[in-house]
A protein has these predicted regions:
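Glycine-rich, proline-tolerant flexible connector loops at the mouths of alpha/beta enzymes
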Residues: 9-27, 82-87
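Active-site-proximal loop/turn and secondary-structure-junction residues that shape catalytic pockets
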Residues: 12-14, 44-46, 80-84, 138-140, ...
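Active-site acidic/histidine proton-transfer and metal-coordination neighborhood
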Residues: 29-36, 47-160
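Conserved beta-strand positions in the central sheet of alpha/beta enzyme cores
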Residues: 9, 39-41, 77, 133, ...
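Short, small-residue-rich loop/turn micro-motifs
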Residues: 34, 41, 80-82, 183, ...
């Protein structure tokens, strides 16, 4: 709240714990500060030939859906997962997010695993009233075609696209426009001070026009990835986004 935000996108791995007392503390702290808890961003990986591994990721996702419900959060950031044939994230970024398919399998296998896994999470999402927002992240959703292949195959009101403005490294505006109609949540990257792996000079007025054209009326969540001190970088980013989106 002190930095000028209206809401908080909670990163699950940064939560201190998951006790009822801690969840109540987060809810009350947000309410007392006049901010809304808007999304629970979680990590899972459905791109694995081992069914037991996929089942553990399904269970984790369903567990996080229940956490979101307890926190009064309406959206969960979902990942498709990736092949994990690249040993480090630094190397993956050096390779522009592209990695080889696991030997002995095909891209279709990965999509089948991911689609089947997300389908198993949907009853819990519907029961909790929590929308799953699949991010254009690394792995199967690195391209708009990959993201839309999953969302369109499932075709559920409880699954949509999460537009991360900084994850299409080439021709971003054309690709963002391709997923805009399916977008239910937006994470907007800024890079003041330079990014950790890369820096994009994003035209946010242009992105705002893309979203407006597709009647997007949801949240714009700042994802600050710059090296500048967040005490100055975050307020600067929020001012820039408010100006671009007319808020």
């Amino acid at each position: 709240a002190e930095l000028g935000a209206d809401g908080v996108d909670v990163l699950h791995v940064q939560m201190d714990n998951e006790t009822p007392e801690y969840l109540r503390f987060l809810r009350e702290r947000a309410e007392n500060r006049g901010v809304e808890l808007i999304c629970l961003s979680i990590h899972q990986d459905f791109v694995d030939p081992n069914k037991d591994t996929r089942d553990r990721n399904i269970d984790h996702t369903i567990h996080c859906i229940e956490l979101a419900k307890e926190l009064g959060i309406s959206y969960i950031r979902l990942n498709s997962g990736r092949w994990n044939t690249t040993s480090s994230f630094d190397q993956l970024m050096a390779d522009r997010g592209i990695e080889p398919i696991l030997p002995g399998f095909t891209e279709d296998d990965g999509f089948d695993w991911c689609i089947g896994s997300i389908k198993e999470c949907l009853p819990a999402a519907e029961k909790a009233g929590v929308v799953l927002a699949l991010e254009n992240h690394w792995g199967l959703t690195r391209t708009p075609e990959g993201l839309l292949r999953i969302v369109n195959a499932i075709d559920s009101p409880w699954l949509g696209a999460l537009m991360d403005t900084g994850n299409f490294l080439e021709d971003p505006y054309d690709k963002l426009e391709q997923i805009a109609a399916q977008t239910v949540f937006v994470q907007a990257k800024t890079y003041y001070g330079g990014g950790e792996w890369y820096t994009l000079d994003l035209d946010y007025p242009r992105i705002a026009q893309i979203l407006e054209k597709n009647d997007y009326q949801g949240y714009i969540s700042l994802e600050f990835e710059g090296k500048e001190d967040p005490n100055t970088g975050v307020p600067k980013s929020l001012r820039s986004l408010r100006k671009a989106f007319g808020q």
